[in-house]
Amino acid sequence: MSILWSYEPELLGTAGGVKRLADRFDDTFVVVSGDALTDVNIKELVEYHREKGALATIALRRVYDTSEFGVVEVDEEGNIQGFQEKPRPEEAISTLANTGIYVFEPQALDYIPEGVFFDFAEDVFPKLLERGERFVGYQEDFYWSDIGTLAAYRQAQYDVLSGKVGVKIPGEKRGEGLWVGEDAQIHSSAEIEGHVLIGKDAVVGRGVKLLGDVTVGSDCWIRPNVTIKRSILLPGASVGGGAYLEDCIVGHHYDVRPQETIRGGALIRRA
């Protein structure tokens, strides 16, 4: 896969950043926000966009709490009628969230000025409605999670391990809900329950308990008699003997001290 990076000395917004690469787009193209986890079928999304003869298409996902999302109103034909930004549920015009996944024709870039901060939701989409452009919403059953909070990040990890997301989990599947990476070492006395991923070259010591949904990244070292519940260890993290972790995220190469008890939050570095 070839990847082209576009560095912005000054941020240009969701639309301004795409406009900066306008000379790269000579056909239908897809924009996907990078802070979400999804298994949306891009092929089907683009086919829908073309069948509708649209200039722009937004992938929509129904949500329960609209106060966290921009919502989109559509008619029976899928045509977008209006937008509302993070309304209270009782005031929402719709429960269909803008996922930040878009399909455009190159002509849509004409609505974006060059070199200035410009946003799709706030600036471009209202113009498309005002001009009466063919602008539609795609509604299908796909997984989507806006990973904008620690709680959402943890939940997305759990959803992957429980099979709710159509993604490939690295490692060898051993029994129901357990994936083990290459050269990982797991002591025979370790207790593992729920959905657990143990990464490449990780070490799980004697008497360790991994309970609930737990992700152990590559090169992690969990020393004896540690208990970890519903937590994520990023690559290179280590946990001292007898420690207890629950509902937390342990950062890259972070060392949890022996006998330490931690509940909730994210551990990045010590003060």
Regions found by a protein language model. Give the residues of each.
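FAD-dependent flavoprotein oxygenase/oxidase catalytic domain
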Residues: S6, R61-R62, E73, E77, ...
